[in-house]
From Swiss-Prot:
Residues given in the record as FAD binding sites: 17-20, 46-53, 361, 377-378
The organism of origin for this protein: Mesorhizobium japonicum (strain LMG 29417 / CECT 9101 / MAFF 303099)
Free-text remark on how the cofactor is bound: Binds 1 FAD per subunit.
Family, as annotated: Belongs to the FAD-dependent oxidoreductase 2 family. NadB subfamily.
One cellular component (GO) term of this entry: cytoplasm
Name assigned to this protein: L-aspartate oxidase
Compartments where found: Cytoplasm
Necessary cofactors: FAD
Length: 513
C-alpha cells in the first residue's frame, strides 16, 4: 500500500477534538501537538451535547469524601477507588481552570456558582453553563483558546484509519483526508474519540460515534476494559429525531416526575424515586414501554412557566416538536448515552501499548465502575486530560518511517448493524440473543466493508456481555438477574474476543446438526 508521509516532526497526535481532546492539547502547550477532527470542529463531538454539567464538591455542605461515596455507590463495586478519589479531589480545581479559560458557568445574583442536583448525588454539586447547554458553552470556550494557541495544529476533516505499531510500540497512524491517504509518523498518540452510542438506534450521541477509538486500540493490540457497561439515559425526548435530544437529569432534580399516559406516577415507591440511579430508572421506563404504555416527564407543577428560563435549550427543542413543557408532559424513552467501558488505562492514561494514551469516554479509568454517576464524565475528561498531557510531555519524542499495512480500511458506517446491536445489547440482555449476535457480527467484522469496524466494536461488547454472567449496574442479564458476591472488572483483547467468537460459532453449528 502507498501513502504520502506527512511530516509532523514527531509531535504527539490527538485523535478527537471534543472536550477531552481540546483539554489535552491545551495542557500540552507550548509543546507542539496535532489535533485531528473527522469533521469540522464541533459538528460531531458528543461533549457538545452535554446538558448536565460537571460534578464537583463546591458547596459548603459538600466534600470530596461525599462526592466519592456517591460515585462508589453508583459504580456498584467496580470503581477503582484510588482513581475515583483522585478525580473527585481534582474536580473543584478543574472547574476553576475552566473558569480561567473562559467558561461562563451559571451564577446566582450574589455571584456564587449555581449548584444543581442530579440523580444519585447526595448534595447539590453540578455546575452548568447557559442552563442546559454546558457542553456547548464549554466547547466554545476551549475551542477559542485552542485556535489562539500557536502550538496546536488542528487538522479538520482528517480521519484516523489505523494505528501503526512496530514491536509493540506506536510508530505512526494511517489517515485519510479528502480521499487521499496519509501516514503521520509519531511515537505518541492520544485517543479522545468519545463513545459508542451511534451503534444503537436510540441514542443521544452523534450517529457517527460507533467506538472509533476502541477499534483503533483493539487492532493495535491494546487491552480493553468493562465493555459490557453501557449507560442508557432514562429520559431522551421520544421523537423521530436522531440523535435523540436529551431531557437533562437536572429537570428531575428540580422536581419533575415520571408518569404514564393516565397520569399515574411510576417511581413513587422506588427508593430514590426519579433520582434513583440511571440503570434503575431506565429499566423501569423500558418495562413500561414494553408493556405498551407511554412514559412522560411532568414538570408542570414544579417548574411550569419557569421551565423556559431554567432549561432554554430543552424548551426550544420540545416546542419545535410541538410540546410545551410548561403545560404538558414530555414524552421520553431511554437512549444509549454513555459507555463506562473503554480502552484500559492507568492513572496517567497510558494504555497497554507503548506510546498510546486514551482520555475521556473512550478510556476506562475505573472512575465509573458499572454505572456512571451523573455529570461525572465531563469532570473526568477535564481532570484526567492534565495527567495524560503530563505523561505525554514526559515521554521522549522522535519518529521512524512506519511500515504501512497492506490495505486501507474503508471509512466506517455503523448503520447496517444498529438494529442487531440494539436488540442484543440494550437495557435487558440474555445469553441466547448475545450468542446469536456474536455469530452474526463475526463475519461482518472481518470483511472489507464500511460496517467492519463498527461490527468489531459491537462484537467485543457482546463477548464482554456474555462473559459477565450476572447483573450489575447498567449490565442486566435476564438469564442471570442476580449479582455475584465478588465484583470483578473485565478485561479483553481482540485476539481473545475472536477466539471466543469462533468457539461460540462452532458450538452453535454443532448444536444445529
Amino acid at each position: 500500500m502507498t501513502a504520502d508521509i506527512h511530516h509532523i516532526g514527531g509531535a504527539p497526535v490527538i485523535i478527537g477534538a471534543g472536550i477531552a481532546g481540546l483539554m489535552t492539547a491545551l495542557h500540552l502547550a507550548p509543546q507542539p501537538v496535532v489535533l485531528l477532527s473527522r469533521t469540522s470542529l464541533g459538528t460531531e463531538a458528543s461533549s457538545i451535547l452535554a446538558q448536565g454539567g460537571l460534578a464537583a464538591s463546591l458547596g459548603e455542605d459538600d466534600s470530596p469524601d461525599l462526592h466519592l461515596a456517591d460515585t462508589l455507590a453508583a459504580g456498584e463495586g467496580l470503581c477503582d477507588e484510588q482513581m475515583a478519589r483522585r478525580v473527585v479531589e481534582a474536580a473543584p480545581q478543574a472547574v476553576e481552570n475552566l473558569i480561567r479559560l473562559g467558561t461562563p458557568f451559571d451564577r446566582s445574583l450574589d455571584g456564587r456558582l449555581q449548584l444543581g442536583l442530579e440523580a444519585a448525588h447526595s448534595r447539590r454539586r453540578i455546575v452548568h453553563a447557559a442552563g442546559d447547554a454546558t457542553g456547548r458553552e464549554l466547547f466554545r470556550a476551549l475551542l477559542g483558546v485552542a485556535r489562539r494557541t500557536r502550538s496546536i495544529t488542528i487538522m479538520e476533516g482528517m480521519t484516523a484509519l489505523r494505528l501503526v505499531v512496530a514491536e509493540g510500540s506506536i510508530v505512526g497512524l494511517l489517515t485519510v483526508l479528502h480521499g487521499a491517504v496519509f501516514a503521520l509518523p509519531t511515537r505518541r498518540v492520544v485517543l479522545a474519540t468519545g463513545g459508542i452510542g451511534g451503534l444503537f438506534c436510540d441514542t443521544t450521541n452523534p450517529l457517527s460515534s460507533f467506538g472509533h477509538g476502541l477499534a483503533l486500540a483493539a487492532c493495535a493490540g491494546a487491552e480493553l476494559a468493562d465493555l459490557e457497561f453501557v449507560q442508557f439515559h432514562p429520559t431522551a425526548l421520544d421523537i423521530a429525531r436522531r440523535p435523540m435530544p436529551l431531557v437533562s437529569e437536572a429537570v428531575r432534580g428540580e422536581g419533575a416526575v415520571l408518569i404514564d399516559e393516565h397520569g399515574h406516577r411510576l417511581l413513587a415507591d422506588t427508593p430514590g424515586a426519579e433520582l434513583a440511579s440511571r440503570d434503575v430508572v431506565a429499566r423501569a421506563i423500558s418495562d413500561q414501554l414494553a408493556a405498551g404504555h407511554g412514559v412522560y416527564l411532568d414538570a408542570r407543577h414544579c417548574l411550569g412557566q419557569k421551565f423556559a428560563r431554567r432549561f432554554p435549550a430543552i424548551d426550544a427543542i420540545c416546542k419545535h416538536a410541538g410540546i410545551d413543557p410548561a403545560v404538558e408532559p414530555i414524552p421520553v424513552r431511554p437512549a444509549a448515552h454513555y459507555h463506562m467501558g473503554g480502552v484500559a488505562v492507568d492513572a496517567e492514561g497510558r494504555t497497554s501499548v507503548s506510546g498510546l494514551w486514551a482520555c475521556g469516554e473512550v478510556a476506562c479509568t475505573g472512575l465509573h465502575g458499572a454505572n456512571r454517576l451523573a455529570s461525572n464524565s465531563l469532570t473526568e475528561a477535564v481532570a484526567t486530560a492534565a495527567w495524560v498531557a503530563e505523561s505525554v510531555a514526559g515521554t521522549s519524542a522522535g519518529w521512524q518511517w512506519p511500515r504501512l499495512p497492506a490495505t486501507v480500511p474503508i471509512r466506517p458506517d455503523p448503520s447496517p448493524i444498529r438494529t442487531i446491536v440494539s436488540n442484543a445489547l440494550g437495557i435487558v440482555r440474555n445469553g441466547k440473543s448475545l450468542c446469536d449476535t456474536v455469530a452474526t457480527l463475526l463475519p461482518i467484522s472481518v470483511c472489507e466493508t464500511a460496517a467492519a469496524d463498527p461490527a468489531l466494536v459491537a462484537l467485543l461488547m457482546a463477548i464482554a456481555a456474555l462473559r459477565r454472567e450476572e447483573s450489575r449496574g447498567s449490565h442486566f442479564r435476564s438469564d442471570f438477574p442476580g449479582r455475584d458476591a465478588a465484583a470483578l472488572p473485565s478485561r479483553l483483547t481482540l485476539c481473545t474476543a475472536f477466539e471466543n467468537a469462533v468457539t461460540l460459532r462452532w458450538q452453535a453449528s454443532e448444536r444445529s446438526r
